[in-house]
Amino acid sequence: MPELPEVEVTRRGIEPYVSGRKVERVDVRTPALRWPIPADLAKTLRGHVVRKVERRGKYLLFEIDAGWFIVHLGMTGTLRVLRHVPHPPAAAKHDHIDWIFDEFILRYRDPRRFGAVLWHPREAGDVLEHPLLASLGVEPFSPAFSGALMHRLTRGRKVSVKQALLAGEIVVGVGNIYASESLFRAGIRPTTAAGRVSLVRYELLADAVRVTLAAAIEKGGSTLRDFVGSNGESGYFQLDYFVYDRAGLPCRVCGTPIKQIVQGQRSTYFCPTCQR
């Protein structure tokens, strides 16, 4: 599943091609993804200029004067920029939506169809008030995110520190891959109860989250199966993983075999020596 780095890489890749450009047409080939695609989406967007593309957590927010269309990539979704002059590229089986601009097509592809394309009209209020966005935690690169915040919001909680990271109620966008990697950098065992992690260690974790996500964005995200950026190229942060998907391999720091366990039906990877 694309996590925050992959979504941010996508945003940075598509924004220069769509911001300030008019949507000439929208071709919707699939009536529903995770939820139904608004029936009048094509009519609503046609002729409007995209003001900017922002990200909130794992959601992409495309602003036009009438409101915002919201895109979530789900498990296998990608957005690619394709040149349609002189000849538009043919759509393949899993290419569900095209936003057509003067020279380019923004194409949404999603083999498993767990993604979403939604509409939030301006009269409904700010897009951040949308039900899917209103309860999200803070952005990891914002000044509001800190070890003190995590420490305060986890007091008395028995859930594991990894599951607290994944929940998205404290900080957004830290999925399974980057939770494992961040906990390794911070030296915290993922099974530790969130309420038992000290303020000092949470400060280390906050720094580790920022460093890990920034490094992943710099390297185009992670491509384990489906993800490609807006130009069709794979990310390569997976080459730098310390623990994720490295079960049985030696720790890059101490040489101890990396251990794999299951938490909340998801695989967790950690070093038994470096993480305590």
From Swiss-Prot:
Keywords: DNA damage, DNA repair, DNA-binding, Glycosidase, Hydrolase, Lyase, Metal-binding, Multifunctional enzyme, Zinc, Zinc-finger. One of its GO terms (molecular function) is damaged DNA binding. PROSITE patterns: FPG_CAT, ZF_FPG_1, ZF_FPG_2. Belongs to the FPG family. Pfam families: Fapy_DNA_glyco (PF01149), H2TH (PF06831), zf-FPG_IleRS (PF06827). Its EC number is 3.2.2.23, 4.2.99.18. The lineage of its organism: Bacteria, Pseudomonadati, Pseudomonadota, Betaproteobacteria, Burkholderiales. A zinc finger (FPG-type) spans 242-276. The keyword DNA damage applies. The active site is at P2 (schiff-base intermediate with dna), E3 (proton donor), K58 (proton donor), R266 (proton donor). One of its GO terms (biological process) is base-excision repair. Monomer. Involved in base excision repair of DNA damaged by oxidation or by mutagenic agents. Acts as a DNA glycosylase that recognizes and removes damaged bases. Has a preference for oxidized purines, such as 7,8-dihydro-8-oxoguanine (8-oxoG). Has AP (apurinic/apyrimidinic) lyase activity and introduces nicks in the DNA strand. Cleaves the DNA backbone by beta-delta elimination to generate a single-strand break at the site of the removed base with both 3'- and 5'-phosphates. HAMAP family: Fapy_DNA_glycosyl. CDD domains: EcFpg-like_N (cd08966). This is Formamidopyrimidine-DNA glycosylase. DNA binds at H94, R112, R157. Its cofactor is Zn(2+). The keyword Phosphoprotein does not apply.
